[in-house]
Amino acid sequence: MMNLLNTSLEENGSFLTALYVICEFVALYLLGRALQAFVQAADACCLFWYTWVVVPGAKGTAFVYKHTYGKKLNNPELEAVIVNEFPKNGWNNKNPANFQNGKLHT
């Protein structure tokens, strides 16, 4: 960097070199402002989609499920499932639960 600055000082003089350095700082400032505006616009876009699409979509899906498929579920049957006897380690379990004819065999 210093070599570039020294070369510019030798070839262009101190005034033009100072002018170039100031122009570089102005360009960096403008680039930063443009990036800031872009990020702000992207943030507003994400907030718009989340507020007007994602949340109502999730609420609508929950509403439809609750009033259609949710009413068809028989909760006593769900509560009768023996959750603690399912394999604790997924497919790697060496001793999986053994169900025969709907009953647990040990």
Swiss-Prot record:
Transmembrane annotation, as ranges: 12-32
Pfam families for the chain: IBV_3C (PF03620)
Chain ranges on the Intravirion side, renumbered to this chain: 33-106
Subcellular location: Host Golgi apparatus membrane
GO CC terms in record: host cell Golgi membrane; membrane
Membrane topology listed for this record: Single-pass type III membrane protein
Virion surface side: 1-11
Taxonomy, superkingdom: Viruses
Keywords assigned by UniProt, alphabetized: Apoptosis, Host Golgi apparatus, Host membrane, Membrane, Transmembrane, Transmembrane helix
GO biological process: disruption of cellular anatomical structure in another organism; viral budding from Golgi membrane
Record's subunit section: Homooligomer. Interacts with the M membrane protein in the budding compartment of the host cell, which is located between endoplasmic reticulum and the Golgi complex. The cytoplasmic tails of both proteins are important for this function. Interacts with Nucleoprotein.
Family: Belongs to the gammacoronaviruses E protein family.
Function according to Swiss-Prot or TrEMBL: Plays a central role in virus morphogenesis and assembly. Acts as a viroporin and self-assembles in host membranes forming pentameric protein-lipid pores that allow ion transport. Also plays a role in the induction of apoptosis.
Protein name: Envelope small membrane protein
